[in-house]
């Protein structure tokens, strides 16, 4: 199933992913068009986060059937679409070198790796 999801993501037409600031310097990620297969209803949810480094941003979660995605602004200039992957605890999403791992109201964004494990994550909390 996960292999099929990765193949799906390679073919998913993400026409526009926009990232913009607001008055309180919070970044917002938004997907304007994303085609996912199946007849299930698309469930979307936006969650605001504030991180230990002071950064504020909004993550958009998209769920449809077996497909779960998170649109995360990983930096001031880059927003990525993450795919849900297997985790022992919480919800774990991957995009390239990045991991977005949530559990309850807490989340961590990892961008560096050592020995096959993510390191130096930035901890964030829902606001």
From Swiss-Prot:
Lipid attachment in record (N-palmitoyl cysteine): 19
Alphabetical keyword list: Cell outer membrane, Disulfide bond, Lipoprotein, Membrane, Palmitate, Signal
Effect of residue 89 to A: Significantly reduced inhibitory activity
Domain of life: Bacteria
Subcellular location: Cell outer membrane
Residue numbers marked as site, Directly involved in lysozyme active site inhibition: 89, 103
Cysteines engaged in disulfide bonds, as pairs: 51-124
Span of the signal peptide: 1-18
Main location: membrane
GO cellular component, one term: cell outer membrane
Membrane topology: Lipid-anchor
InterPro entries: MliC, MliC_sf
PROSITE patterns from the UniProt entry: PROKAR_LIPOPROTEIN (PS51257)
Lipidation (S-diacylglycerol cysteine): 19
Function statement: Specifically inhibits C-type lysozymes.
Assembly mode: Homodimer.
Family statement: Belongs to the MliC family. Type 2 subfamily.
Protein name in the entry: Membrane-bound lysozyme inhibitor of C-type lysozyme
Record organism: Pseudomonas aeruginosa (strain ATCC 15692 / DSM 22644 / CIP 104116 / JCM 14847 / LMG 12228 / 1C / PRS 101 / PAO1)
């Amino acid at each position: 199933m996960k292999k099929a999801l990765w193949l799906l993501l390679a073919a998913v037409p993400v026409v526009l992913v926009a990232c913009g600031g607001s008055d309180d310097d919070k970044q917002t990620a938004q997907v304007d068009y994303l085609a996912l297969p199946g007849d299930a209803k698309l469930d979307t949810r936006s969650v605001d986060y504030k991180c230990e480094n002071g950064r504020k941003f909004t993550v958009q979660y998209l769920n449809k059937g077996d497909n779960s995605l998170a649109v995360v602004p990983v930096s001031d200039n880059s927003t990525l679409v993450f795919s849900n992957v297997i985790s022992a605890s919480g919800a774990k999403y991957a995009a390239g070198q990045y991991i977005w791992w949530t559990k309850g109201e807490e989340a961590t964004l990892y961008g560096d790796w050592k020995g096959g494990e993510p390191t130096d994550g930035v901890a964030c909390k829902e606001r």
